[in-house]
């Protein structure tokens, strides 16, 4: 089977490509990791790679996730975060292609004030341009054949820093840095997400709809960071507890906790607890 990964130079897309290419039953195509990087924001380029690869599955891990950048350059970030998705389905329709799309979305769409995990049917909060764009991309997908995974992830990479790497570097720098006391999330290890996608591919569980994909519980950013630092034996008191929206210029969601019961039921996968994910990441990569 041919699988096309878009966004393969990003944190998740790159690791997903490396993971899936080791399976002989899967022919993984990407839009460029090395010297030949194809700009999929150009519709002609996107059409070419889709037609050339003739995929049965497209995994869209592309996008601009920098919330501040999305606010500064709404036009360019919209082109990448929304127009690319629109173009995928226009190409599919024009050339009568038959592929399924997995679209990675964001937990920034949630902000339940009750501080309980958010369900897929809960109220959507548009706190910034990034969440507005991700919702627009989701609406396009919902009209087509696609699975939308609202997620958050962490995990060490030699190509691009993830949240845990920022935490590690911040603690060992022994300089003051902020940790947020009021932002909660339920991330998974990148490696865990890769394994889940592999399971979905081999089981051919291509199911339309929106699904929360995260750990089975969550923590505040400060709790995550302190646990991570202590398990890595780098803990110190240089961090400064702070409220996120007093520090960040662009408003962020505070409660991004994910209720993952729907995903577990539909895909028959038991998702891990966040504490176990932290322990596994340190054991394997630190």
Regions found by a protein language model. Name each.
Residues 3-23:
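N-terminal Rossmann NAD(P)H-binding glycine-rich loop of SDR-like oxidoreductase domains
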Residues 72-102:
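NAD(P)-cofactor binding segment of oxidoreductase domains
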Residues 139-185, 190-199:
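NAD(P)-dependent short-chain dehydrogenase/reductase
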Residues 196, 203-249, 254:
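Mid/C-terminal beta-alpha module of Rossmann-like enzyme folds, strongest
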Residues 179-184, 211-218, 266:
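Glycine-rich Rossmann NAD(P)(H)-binding loop
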Residues 264, 272-286:
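Amphipathic terminal alpha-helices
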Residues 79, 83-84, 108-149, 153-159:
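Catalytic helix-loop patch of NAD(P)-dependent Rossmann-fold dehydrogenases
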Residues 40-80:
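NAD(P)H-binding glycine-rich loop region in Rossmannoid oxidoreductase-like domains
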């Amino acid at each position: 089977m041919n699988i096309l990964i878009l966004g393969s130079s990003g944190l998740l897309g790159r690791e997903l490509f490396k993971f899936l290419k080791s399976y002989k039953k899967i022919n993984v195509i990407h839009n460029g990791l090395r010297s030949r990087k194809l700009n999929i924001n150009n519709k002609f380029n996107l059409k070419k790679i889709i037609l050339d690869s003739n995929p049965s599955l497209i995994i869209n891990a592309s996008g601009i996730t920098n919330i501040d950048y999305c606010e500064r350059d709404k036009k360019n970030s919209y082109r990448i975060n929304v127009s690319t998705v629109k173009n995928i389905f226009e190409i599919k329709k024009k050339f009568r292609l038959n592929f399924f799309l997995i679209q990675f979305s964001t937990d920034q769409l949630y902000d339940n004030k009750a501080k309980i995990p958010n369900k897929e049917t809960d109220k959507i909060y548009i706190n910034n341009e990034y969440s507005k764009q991700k919702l627009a991309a989701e609406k396009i997908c919902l009209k087509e054949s696609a699975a939308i995974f609202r997620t958050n992830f962490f995990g060490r990479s030699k190509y691009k820093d993830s949240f845990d790497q920022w935490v590690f570097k911040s603690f060992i720098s022994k300089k003051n840095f902020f940790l947020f006391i009021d932002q909660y999330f339920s991330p998974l290890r990148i490696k865990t997400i890769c394994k889940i996608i592999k399971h979905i591919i081999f089981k051919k569980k291509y199911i339309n709809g929106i699904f929360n994909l995260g750990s089975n519980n969550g923590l505040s950013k400060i709790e995550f960071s302190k646990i991570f630092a202590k398990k890595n034996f780098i803990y110190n008191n240089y961090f400064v507890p702070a409220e996120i929206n007093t520090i960040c210029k662009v408003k962020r969601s505070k409660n991004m906790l994910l209720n993952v019961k729907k995903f577990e039921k539909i895909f028959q996968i038991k998702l891990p607890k966040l504490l176990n994910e932290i322990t596994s990441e340190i054991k394997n990569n630190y």
